[in-house]
């Protein structure tokens, strides 16, 4: 299904199914592209209910007609949740919508199942951590979804016996976690911008910064998308270390955190590119439009005024998420909850300018919240 002919002639509307952190990322970039944002979530207290232009609270599985009706006034529908039942349902009714669904369901089923993903990596010769190594340290992770819950390093053989059934056991590969998004239209695949994923002790991401072009990583990511004939978006994660690149997972769904860093460092809006994948098609990227620096991070304010890095697991427990402060090169979002969590975005022509803006942003938190910076 192609986009409506009125595309570009009026304010475009995107309907997001999911009101948590993936939804926030997609809503943020949709607004940057000048779109009207509708969010649908069955939770009346959905985290981004107040950030959306329109919020509709209903269960799409129980009341699908409401979603079909909303699709009549939307240019596209984008699932932004990892609820298996919800994704399966959207897959079963995808032909009933009046607008395109910006999602590759076939690629998602492979990417969601980490065992299937590893078989896929092996089938096209992609380097990946060794399965069930003979001796520790081991890295264990859940078999499904992109969650970091339960992921950890194990140094003792005995601990392996007490693992939850189905957990994946791999060699522990030392290095940095790097990420790269690819958007495909089924025939052409745009590899976008490398980012460094800064993780905490629970393997949850608390900061994202851009990286220079990595030809090997780009080539591997392109192959992963091309061999699936990807029509949609896919996030490729790897460990970059002394042993070279090892691909740890793919996720064929709209990511959170990295797209904002990609937007400010490269000038590419992944939502706009995703729309093109289902419309006029995408072009493979020879040169990125911009080469800037961006710092994207989450900080929680403690009672004593200290700011500590936190990941999405903490953020997702919030009650409301939205804009707090904005000026050129600085954006601050506030996630209300038991303790306030700030998402800070700083960008500039280089690392130094972004760093100066970070200092200013932190001083704003000091003035307004008494944060110790």
Named regions from a protein language model:
Residues 50-59, 99-100, 138-140, 167-169, ...:
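Active-site regions of enzymes building and remodeling cell-envelope glycoconjugates
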Residues 171-229, 240, 251-278, 287-291, ...:
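ATP-dependent carboxylate/phosphate-activation module, predominantly the ATP-grasp catalytic core
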Residues 244-246:
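Conserved protein kinase catalytic/activation segment
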Residues 1-104, 283, 347-350, 357-373:
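ATP-binding N-terminal substructure of ATP-dependent carboxylate-amine bond-forming enzymes
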Residues 16, 36-41, 77-79, 128-131, ...:
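Short, hydrophobic beta-strand segments that form beta-sheet elements in well-ordered domains
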Residues 108-177, 184-189, 195-200, 205-223, ...:
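Active-site nucleotide/adenylate-binding loops and adjacent lid/helix of ATP-dependent enzymes
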Residues 230-236:
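Active-site-adjacent "lid" and substrate-binding segments of diverse enzymatic cores
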Residues 275-373:
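Peripheral (often C-terminal) accessory segments that flank ATP-dependent C-N-forming ligase machineries
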């Amino acid at each position: 299904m192609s986009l409506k002919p009125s595309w570009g002639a009026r304010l475009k509307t995107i309907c997001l199914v999911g009101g948590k952190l993936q939804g926030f990322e997609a809503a943020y970039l949709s607004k940057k592209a000048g779109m009207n944002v509708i969010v649908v979530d069955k939770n009346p207290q959905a985290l981004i209910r107040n950030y959306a232009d329109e919020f509709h609270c209903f269960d799409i599985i129980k009341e699908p007609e409401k979603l079909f009706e909303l699709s009549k006034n939307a240019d596209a529908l984008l699932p932004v949740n990892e609820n298996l039942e919800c994704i399966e349902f959207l897959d079963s009714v995808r032909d009933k919508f009046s607008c395109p669904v910006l999602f590759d369901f076939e690629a998602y089923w492979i990417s969601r199942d980490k065992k299937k993903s590893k078989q896929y990596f092996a089938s096209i010769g992609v380097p990946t951590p060794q399965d069930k190594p003979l001796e520790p340290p081991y890295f264990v992770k859940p078999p499904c979804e992109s969650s970091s819950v339960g992921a950890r390093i194990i140094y003792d053989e005995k601990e392996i016996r007490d693992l939850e059934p189905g957990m994946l056991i791999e060699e522990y590969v030392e290095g940095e976690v790097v990420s790269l998004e690819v958007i495909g239209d089924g025939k052409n695949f745009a590899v976008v911008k490398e980012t460094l994923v800064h993780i905490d002790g629970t393997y949850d991401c608390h900061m994202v910064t851009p990286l220079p072009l990595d030809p090997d990583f780009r080539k591997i990511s392109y192959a992963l998308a091309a061999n699936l004939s990807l029509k949609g978006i896919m996030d490729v994660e790897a460990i970059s270390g002394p042993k070279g690149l090892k691909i740890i997972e793919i996720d064929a769904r709209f990511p959170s955190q990295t797209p904002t860093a990609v937007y400010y460092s490269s000038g590419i809006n992944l939502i706009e590119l995703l729309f093109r994948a289902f419309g006029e098609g995408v072009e493979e990227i020879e040169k990125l439009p911009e080469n800037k620096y961006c710092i994207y991070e989450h900080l929680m304010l403690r009672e004593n005024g200290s700011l500590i890095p936190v990941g999405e697991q903490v953020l997702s427990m919030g009650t409301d998420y939205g804009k707090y402060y904005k000026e050129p090169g600085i954006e601050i979002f506030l996630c209300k909850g038991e303790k306030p969590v700030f998402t800070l975005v700083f960008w500039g022509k280089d690392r130094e300018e972004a760093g100066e803006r970070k200092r200013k942003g932190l001083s704003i938190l000091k003035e307004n919240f008494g944060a110790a910076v």
